[in-house]
Design a protein with these regions (language model features):
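Short strand-loop junctions, especially beta-strand C-caps/beta-turns
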Residues: 82, 110, 157-159, 186
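N-terminal loops that bind phosphate or other acidic moieties
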Residues: 100-103, 152-153, 158
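Conserved catalytic-core segment of NTP-binding enzymes
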Residues: 120, 133-146, 151, 159-263
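Active-site flanking residues adjacent to catalytic metal/cofactor-binding acidic residues
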Residues: 110, 154, 211
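Primarily NTPase-proximal linker/entry elements flanking Walker-type ATP/GTP-binding cores
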Residues: 1-113, 120-138, 142, 146
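Short glycine- and Lys/Arg-enriched binding-loop motifs that mark or flank ligand-binding interfaces
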Residues: 77, 154, 236
């Protein structure tokens, strides 16, 4: 039986079909981005004038997601995440960037349980000519004075996001720190696992996230899944290069360029 014809005088509101296997669709799918998200981006990009793929994709990204870099010229930030995602190196890179901009920087670690974490941050701090402060419990964090004109970067121990006791302990530290919690995620993970992890930290108050290991992964599906599912904002992206390098401010344009890079 033939499908019923469209009634005369009505408007067909179905979305126009996409070109089969469009170059943009293939490029996004190669990152492991779920098909519904890919097609949403492609439709928004196709609605833009012009044939500059990077520009139309950037416009689509700006419509769908938030971009809110830390900037690290001022403020008080408490960095959180799972073990091994690169929080300490991320903090050191952001500190180096702030120093380069002529900003006063304060480095604090609340990771009192891991000597290696303290030693790693101290090594980076020495390179930058900064003394670190250790505030390993809620009382010590609560006692930290607020320094006007300085950016304060606070490291924390990585936690198992599925451990209620570890989540509770981290939440207490974050509250005592009186700082904005910022999620640090490593690129290259499974998208579903990454979203589940990010969901836990969003519930702890994170509204922005930093991505590490951008230079050693080829697929950004997990990175793209987080703002799609949770609505938190892209902040900075980091590469494991020299301490004073490898900090990228996420914008719709820079993300579009990364998604379209040939691999």
């Amino acid at each position: 039986m033939s499908p019923p014809s469209q009634p005369t005088g009505t408007i067909d509101r179905r979305p126009a079909p996409l070109p089969e296997d469009s170059a943009l669709e293939l490029a996004l799918a190669a990152h492991g981005i779920p098909t519904p998200q890919v097609r949403k981006l492609v439709r928004l990009a196709a609605a833009q004038p012009g044939d500059d793929c990077a520009a139309t994709l950037a416009h689509a990204l700006a419509q769908l997601y938030l971009f809110n870099p830390l900037g690290v010229t001022a403020g008080r930030f408490f960095f959180v995440g799972a073990p091994g995602v690169g929080k300490t190196l991320a903090i050191a890179k952001l500190a180096a960037q702030a120093k380069t901009c002529g900003c006063a920087v304060r480095l604090v670690t609340s990771d009192g349980a891991r000597r290696v974490g303290i030693d790693q941050l101290r090594h980076f701090a020495t390179t930058l000519g900064i003394e670190i402060e250790i505030a390993a419990d809620t009382a010590a964090l609560d006692a930290l004075d607020v320094r006007t004109g300085a950016v304060t970067l606070i490291d924390s121990a990585g936690i198992n996001p599925y451990s209620p006791s570890e989540r509770t302990a981290l939440e207490a530290l974050a509250t005592a720190a009186r700082a904005e919690p910022v999620l640090v995620l490593a690129a290259g993970g499974d998208p579903a696992d990454t979203v589940e992890t990010a969901h836990v930290f969003r519930d702890l108050g994170c509204q922005r996230f930093i991505v590490t290991r951008l230079d050693i992964v080829q697929r950004l599906g997990s990175v793209m899944a987080v703002p799609e599912a949770l609505g938190i904002a892209f902040a900075e992206g980091l590469s494991a290069t020299a301490l004073g390098q490898g900090v990228e401010t996420f914008t719709a344009e820079s993300l579009a360029a990364r998604l379209l890079q040939s691999r």
